A protein has these predicted regions:
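Active-site neighborhoods and metal-handling regions in enzymes and metal-associated proteins
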Residues: 1-337
């Protein structure tokens, strides 16, 4: 549904969009009749309690208008159509059905000013909530309590909802990049990784801080400094025209010099927008090139099993000459509790 929201403005959860030479048709059922009239732009709205029958009928009408003797070509989003629906649509329906991967996702990579402003608003709400949680203290509280307060605080700060379930991982559990918050209490001398984000006007923020004790152990402090340097190196590489994998390379080179590369187990970053994970990917597998208007994360991390982890993440807007932060919490020094 994200692509339909991007193209039409519809924020509901069930609809089909048909694009043909005759025009754009938005098909949904009666549950969304009023919502679609309020939100949908640039499309004819069709309300039908037999949605897929209506879609089939309109596809057949459109294909009959093609020149005689020439089969119609019907493109569909292959990532978003189940095998069952594909069989339903193609059964007895003449034409060449063409699977198209990511036709809209490619358009969504470059953000307009209004989209960036929405993400900035989401980041402000998320960061404001985090600062309130930190001011109340973490020690002695459980990871679940901190995550719940953080997500509740985002809404009080003006967010529609969290953009994903917050990660709060303390002590040795912070070595799990996607740890689920547990009922474990946060110890006095433990580091805590907090990965969090909010949603405003449909758009997401994504940010990670590593909170360490006021007097951290030397190994934990070295880890933090290594990740901070790697992130700064990655951010300096972000600018229009640079291959995405080049940003990942810069981060890996920095961690390699610090001796932590083998503990970096994921890619450097990803695009953010209406979805929390979008193209492009800042990884060695990516063939994309950064372009003005993209918003990506730069989020190196070091994860040592049995000891703990550190991750630092910001959202960066790509411009011609540099990358500008969309998230605003400072990362040069650790957040100390």
């Amino acid at each position: 549904m994200t692509n339909i929201r991007y193209l039409t403005g519809f924020s509901g959860s069930d609809a089909v969009l048909l694009v043909s030479p005759e025009g754009v048709t938005f098909v949904t059922d009666g549950r969304y009749a009023e919502q679609s009239r309020r939100e949908v732009r640039g499309a004819e709205i069709v309300i039908s309690d037999r949605k897929w029958s209506e879609v089939l009928r309109r596809i057949r009408l459109s294909t009959r208008r093609r020149r005689p003797g020439r089969a119609a070509r019907i493109g569909f989003e292959s990532r978003h159509l189940s095998v069952e629906l594909y069989r339903l649509l193609t059964r007895g329906n003449a034409g060449d059905w063409v699977a198209i991967a990511d036709p809209v996702e490619a358009l969504r990579m470059r953000k307009e000013e209004a989209e960036v402003r929405a993400m900035e608003g989401a980041a402000v709400a998320a960061s404001g909530a985090l600062l309130e949680v930190l001011s109340a203290g973490l020690r002695g509280r459980t990871e679940k309590e901190v995550a719940a307060d953080l997500e509740r605080g985002m809404k009080l700060q003006g967010a529609e909802e969290p953009s994903f379930r917050a990660i709060v991982a303390s002590g040795p559990r912070s070595a799990l990049p996607h740890a689920e918050p547990t009922g474990s209490g946060i110890g006095r001398d433990e580091g805590v990784v907090i990965d969090f984000g909010a949603r405003r006007r449909g758009y997401c923020s994504d940010e990670t801080v590593s909170v360490i004790p006021a007097r951290p152990s030397p190994p934990l402090r070295r880890m933090f400094d290594a990740v901070r340097r790697a992130q700064e190196r990655g951010i300096r590489a972000v600018r229009a025209g640079v291959l995405c994998r080049e940003v990942d390379t810069r981060v890996r080179e920095s961690l390699d010099r610090s001796g932590y590369l083998k503990y970096f187990v994921h890619s450097t970053g990803h695009g953010v927008g209406l979805d929390i994970h979008e193209r492009p990917s800042l990884s060695q597998r990516s063939r994309d090139r950064l372009a003005e208007g993209m918003v990506v994360t730069v989020e190196p991390g070091v994860y040592i099993p049995g000891f703990g982890g550190v991750r630092i993440e910001d959202m960066i807007r790509v411009t011609a000459g540099r990358g500008d932060r969309v998230t605003y919490l400072p990362k040069q020094d650790p957040l100390l509790v």
